[in-house]
Amino acid sequence: MHKSKCIKRVFTFLLALFVFVMAIPATKVSAAGGTDRSATQVVSDMRVGWNIGNSLDSFGQSYNFPYTSLNETYWGNPATTKALIDEVAKAGFNTIRIPVSWGQYTTGSDYQIPDFVMNRVKEVVDYCIVNDMYVILNSHHDINSDYCFYVPNNANKDRSEKYFKSIWTQIAKEFKNYDYHLVFETMNEPRLVGHGEEWWFPRNNPSNDIREAVACINDYNQVALDAIRATGGNNATRCVMVPGYDASIEGCMTDGFKMPNDTASGRLILSVHAYIPYYFALASDTYVTRFDDNLKYDIDSFFNDLNSKFLSRNIPVVVGETSATNRNNTAERVKWADYYWGRAARYSNVAMVLWDNNIYQNNSAGSDGECHMYIDRNSLQWKDPEIISTIMKHVDGTPATINGKEIPSTEQPDPTPVDPDPTPVDPDPTPVDPDPTPVDPDPQPVDPTPVSGALKAEYTINNWGSGYQVLIKVKNDSASRVDGWTLKISKSEVKIDSSWCVNIAEEGGYYVITPMSWNSSLEPSASVDFGIQGSGSIGTSVNISVQ
């Protein structure tokens, strides 16, 4: 063989090999950085996300279980494409939540996930990873009226634990080499399906059924987390999101809910959903189409709640679903987005993820609460770009491209919380009056109530004539930890209609205020914030005794 021919053949082979390698689709799965970022760092970097709703979470009829082909398009949406994810990234979103209903495909008593499902989910995850985006991967409609692969009650606890251990072991193994950009979410809106309190319950006085459900949800979060950690690799320190009952603010604020124990430090994130204000954002029967100042109360209360129990204790929060249904009121939804995301931007450890189900057109009355399309998945055009640009101005100042037009950058907001004394939460998430009387914008600060011992009580009165709120702070000024505390207020001075973050009892002529389990202990210099709300009139000061 002539040397020149040999060289030519070698060159030809190498060229062909090069062309072949270059033809292989590049999928960036970064494991180099591992999962060495804390939950606070990850959530701070996430900031704003978008849901691929009604896609991989779509499910078919239970009589066809187990499905042997994907139901991704079963609810009428097109299959997710990389082009769609590219457009979402261009608009400024850096987080994608991928809801997946795994159970409908599982086989055997050990709930095996078929390869065709896992491969497709991985493909969509990689669409996001190559865009340098965060991904939230969850177990979605595995509890509903058609499928109940888990149920939060003691009667179904054993099989539910088995389900979570199995699917999360499989999912975690498949993605164990992905870096911190992949976040797992144990469950979506776990609840008692069909129960009278499926979607709401009084947080300070839950029924026995709800108490049992909350305890089971705590257990399922722990089982799922343990299964993920046991797979090792990057999963040993991967960030994991966990919800409370129905992922609502009531579900995480009720006294029985707790974050799971974790072998990794600082890797847990609270998952909560908030379509608020409810009458504006989600309601279909009684609803309002205008977002005015009176509706800001629900949003303020929501963040103040989160701050009191989680954010102030260095537990970051992802609002995994939020949106306001399209009631043919784009200008009002722009106001809503401006206030909601502006409020979130005060906290460095909160990320917001917009729900999108690809349904846009409402009826003529605007009464449908499920119209949450922001980008048309067929045309890849944003439907109400002014809403998206309004959201982005509160994120990080990075220019975004929406429908081919670059949106100018804005000054980055200060992520530091500016409201250390939170406005209270209305314990009823479905208020009778959608236009509540606003709180006096100029509240009356009152000097601290002098007390003996280690604790000091401070309060501020918000008085609007027909009602009032008293925001109370109890602080430990001693050098020792205080376990348990009690406050008393005379009934002659206040009439308490509702409260938040505390328990209220009556004793003769006094209201007796005691803490929840999670805020009963105060370290030196620590404090706890809570409040009471009443109707009628109130003076300029009240006498609070601390015991």
From Swiss-Prot:
Skewed-composition ranges (Pro residues): 414-448
Keywords assigned: Carbohydrate metabolism, Cellulose degradation, Glycosidase, Hydrolase, Polysaccharide degradation
GO molecular function: beta-glucosidase activity; cellulase activity; polysaccharide binding
Alphabetical list of SUPFAM superfamilies matching this protein: (Trans)glycosidases, Carbohydrate-binding domain
Entry's transmembrane regions: none
GO BP annotations, alphabetical order: cellulose catabolic process
InterPro entries named among the record's database cross-references: CBD2, CBM2/CBM3_carb-bd_dom_sf, CBM2_carb-bd_dom_sf, CBM2_CS, Glyco_hydro_5, Glyco_hydro_5_CS, Glycoside_hydrolase_SF, Glycosyl_hydrolase_5
Gene Ontology CC: cell surface; extracellular region
Any matching Pfam family: CBM_2
Enzyme type, top EC level: hydrolase
Reaction catalyzed: Endohydrolysis of (1->4)-beta-D-glucosidic linkages in cellulose, lichenin and cereal beta-D-glucans
UniProt-listed Enzyme Commission number(s): 3.2.1.4
Region of interest: Disordered: 398-450
Active-site residues, Swiss-Prot/TrEMBL: E189 (proton donor), E321 (nucleophile)
Domain CBM2 span(s) in chain numbering: 448-547
Domain of life assignment: Bacteria
Sequence similarity: Belongs to the glycosyl hydrolase 5 (cellulase A) family.
PANTHER family: ENDOGLUCANASE, PUTATIVE (AFU_ORTHOLOGUE AFUA_5G01830)-RELATED (PTHR31297:SF41), GLUCAN ENDO-1,6-BETA-GLUCOSIDASE B (PTHR31297)
Protein's UniProt name: Endoglucanase 1
Encoding gene, per UniProt annotation: end1
